[in-house]
Amino acid sequence: MKTFMIILLVICSILIVGRVEANDNKRKYLLLDPCLRPNAPPGCHRQPYKPRTPVNVYSRGCTTINRCRRVQNP
C-alpha cells in the first residue's frame, strides 16, 4: 500500500510540474511592450553595451564665474 501511494504521489507531481511549465510559454505573449516580445518590430533593438546615463544631470544653476552666491554689501 505504501508503494502505491508513493507511485501515485510521484505521478501527480510530474503532471503538476508539466502543467506549470506549459503555462510559462503563454505568459511571454502577454507583454504589453512590443519590443520585449519574441518577434519585435524593426527599430526595437536594444544595445546592451551602451552605458547608462542619468536622466537629469544635477546642476546648481550658477557657476563661480557668475558669482550667484555672493552677498551684496549695503
UniProtKB/Swiss-Prot annotation:
The keyword Secreted applies. Pfam families: RALF (PF05498). Its main location: secreted. Disulfide bonds join C35-C44, C62-C68. GO terms for cellular component: apoplast. It is found in: Secreted. GO terms for molecular function: hormone activity. Residues 1-22 form the signal peptide. GO terms for biological process: calcium-mediated signaling; cell-cell signaling; regulation of growth. Keywords: Disulfide bond, Hormone, Secreted, Signal. Transmembrane segments: none annotated. The keyword Signal applies. Cell signaling peptide that may regulate plant stress, growth, and development. Mediates a rapid alkalinization of extracellular space by mediating a transient increase in the cytoplasmic Ca(2+) concentration leading to a calcium-dependent signaling events through a cell surface receptor and a concomitant activation of some intracellular mitogen-activated protein kinases. PANTHER family: PROTEIN RALF-LIKE 10-RELATED, PROTEIN RALF-LIKE 15-RELATED. Belongs to the plant rapid alkalinization factor (RALF) family. This is Protein RALF-like 25. It comes from Arabidopsis thaliana. The gene is RALFL25.
